């Protein structure tokens, strides 16, 4: 059964963040004012930050447990993280960025998977372009294609549309929902 169980505490300046929830496959949103700890929660799940105490379990596998001193590296967690600014490598082409997400397989298998993701995310013809030459929506699709190439068990979306105007934001939210419709694990979406 696909599930994500989070029960953590993290001291943040003058307050202690307490994040406790459980979700199965499907989309769940974390909503709240800026600075309340939504992004910190995602970073703790991804292994980018370490909670002070608690436990994080993904699909029955313990990612973090303060009592048992378990703290898997980000690479071991199999969690896809879409940053606010997409975190594409500016010196690499679209194709190279997507290839970075593929861990296993021969060179030809990796190229075939990258080509499949280019088609799936409607990025054909942009393979040799660099991120700076792409629109925000195209950059987001490249980042998502790269994430899905790594076969994550959960996807974390950290305010993916925070910098966009409301009309563009609405269109990209619809597009993102379509692109993630085939993903069968938990999807955690942070917004404010």
Residue ranges and their predicted role:
Residues 61-66, 109-126, 177-178:
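Conserved ABC ATPase "signature" region
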Residues 63-80, 104-112:
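ABC ATPase NBD coupling module
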Residues 91-101:
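Short coil-to-helix segment of the ABC ATPase nucleotide-binding domain corresponding to the Q-loop/switch region
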Residues 130-134, 138:
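Conserved ABC ATPase signature
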Residues 144:
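Hydrophobic anchor residue at the start of the ABC signature
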Residues 149-153:
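A short, proline-enriched helix->beta-strand linker immediately N-terminal to the Walker B motif
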Residues 155-159:
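Catalytic Walker B motif of ABC-type/P-loop ATPase nucleotide-binding domains
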